[in-house]
């Protein structure tokens, strides 16, 4: 029963991280709206446009991170409900690690949460080394899929997540 509690803690961390992402995203969207309105009327238009572009990049990164966390959340829920590991769950975790490595927009708070999720998953679940090795190779595909899903969601189109 100890493993179920540990994996439940990972699920809680995932949900906390997703809520914090939503809060950050809302703040960024508000700031972006403000920058866009200022860039229409101010003398410092170039600076406002540059900041707006940076805010859009941060927003896209947060969207991708949210998609990966959503995928992990689904995988962890499945593990809790059926009692054994889903084969592609480690690939999604490795994608989270890759995103963190490349994520210049990750705040220290979110970085710590991502580390807790990653380490908590592997401490709660005994993953065979051959699955972990293949997961590292598949992580790039998962990351690309998450970016594609984030773009679709941003455009207002719905896309099903392949779990």
Model-derived segments and spans:
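Long C-terminal interaction segments enriched in charged/acidic composition
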Residues: 1-33, 51, 67-163
């Amino acid at each position: 029963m100890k493993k179920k509690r540990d994996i439940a803690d990972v699920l809680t961390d995932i949900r906390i991280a997703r809520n914090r992402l939503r809060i950050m995203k809302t703040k960024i969207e508000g700031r972006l709206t403000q920058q866009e309105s200022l860039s229409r009327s101010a003398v410092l238009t170039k600076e406002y446009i540059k900041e707006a572009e940076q805010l859009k990049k941060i927003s896209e990164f947060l969207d991708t991170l949210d998609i990966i966390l959503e995928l992990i959340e689904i995988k962890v829920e499945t593990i809790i409900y059926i009692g054994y590991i889903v084969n592609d769950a480690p690939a999604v975790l490795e994608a989270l690690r890759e995103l963190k490595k490349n994520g210049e927009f990750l705040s220290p708070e979110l970085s710590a949460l991502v580390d807790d999720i990653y380490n908590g998953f592997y401490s709660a679940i005994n993953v065979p080394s051959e699955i972990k090795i293949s997961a590292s190779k598949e992580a790039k595909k998962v990351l690309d899929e998450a970016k594609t899903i984030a773009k679709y969601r941003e455009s207002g189109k719905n896309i099903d997540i392949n779990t």
